[in-house]
């Protein structure tokens, strides 16, 4: 039975599924051109985090990679030491090692995270055995789901999670899955103080945009969005936020210029509704205004 059959939620895999007799030991090539074998070199005895990507993806892949880049920074030097990140291309005909290396650099990937390519039939087999393939893949714009497989091969425990979840949540999920009760304690909710209500625009920005953008804190993978609602035509901005892939495909000069300036990183189409865009743009506008507004006299930021 494939792992996919028991991976409907974040739960351990069935006992007896896994090991050298289950996972293919096929050769793959890293972004540095090194040939490795999937089971012997990448899985055996290791704690791993695996997802599927391809570099020409205009859907969830850029967000997946940006999110995992944030998670990698949160996990620090454990990535590559006792936790291993693997992103496997499902478009090996295009995604050569050189292409994958350039793609990783765009997202500021640190050492310890491998981007892998190989034969298409081998990658399909890996995807199926990991439980990362789905009957809905063909209907998906990306050809796959934005899923993440977290696994401890030594104990044959596996958990599937969204690859575009909150990075702090993902990092803590990974640590607790691998470390159990030995994981470092986190701050108590009692110490957090009062919580403010989160509006739709703020929720969308923090859940969909912060992996690649800031407002007033400089460029990341994409541009700083400070004053973007003032600098860009409102109708153009709304259309671009809703369907950036379509605007770029039409050869729009602003979209083309942004694409070139930010190292050909494709802004993902996040399937935002008109209502989503109508909430997101005012939030960005308000945040820009708050940054521009002088702090009250006597406040720490005014001193």
What residue ranges belong to the model's regions?
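Short active-site neighborhood of thiol/selenol oxidoreductases, capturing the structured segment around
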Residues: 38-64, 68
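The canonical Cys-X-X-Cys-His
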Residues: 57-61, 148, 201, 205-215, ...
């Amino acid at each position: 039975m494939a792992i996919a059959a028991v991976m409907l939620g974040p739960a351990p895999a069935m006992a007896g599924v896994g090991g050298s007799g289950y996972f293919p030991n096929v050769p793959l090539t890293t972004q540095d051109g090194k040939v490795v074998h999937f089971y012997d070199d990448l899985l055996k005895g290791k704690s791993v985090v695996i997802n599927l990507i391809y570099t020409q993806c205009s859907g969830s892949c850029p967000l997946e990679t940006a999110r995992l880049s944030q998670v990698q920074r949160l996990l620090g030097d454990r990535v590559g030491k006792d936790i291993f990140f693997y992103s496997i291309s499902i478009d090996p005909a295009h995604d050569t090692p050189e292409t994958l290396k350039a793609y990783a650099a765009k997202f500021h990937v640190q050492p310890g995270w491998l981007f892998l390519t190989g034969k298409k039939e081998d990658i399909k087999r890996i995807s199926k055995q990991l439980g990362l393939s789905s009957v809905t893949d063909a209907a998906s714009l990306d050809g796959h789901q934005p899923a993440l497989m977290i696994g401890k091969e030594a104990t044959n425990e596996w958990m599937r999670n969204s690859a575009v979840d909150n990075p702090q949540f993902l990092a803590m999920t990974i640590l607790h899955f691998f470390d159990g009760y030995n994981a470092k304690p986190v701050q108590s909710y009692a110490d957090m103080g009062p919580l403010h209500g989160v509006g739709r625009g703020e929720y969308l920005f923090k859940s969909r945009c912060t992996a690649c953008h800031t407002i007033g804190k400089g460029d990341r993978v994409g541009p700083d969005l400070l004053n973007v609602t003032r600098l860009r035509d409102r109708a153009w901005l709304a259309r671009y936020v809703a369907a950036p892939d379509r605007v770029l495909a039409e050869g729009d000069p602003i979209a083309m210029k942004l694409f070139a300036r930010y190292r050909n990183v494709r802004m993902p189409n996040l399937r935002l509704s008109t209502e989503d865009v109508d909430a997101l743009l005012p939030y960005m506008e308000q945040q820009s205004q708050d940054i521009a507004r002088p702090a009250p006299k006597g406040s720490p930021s005014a001193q």
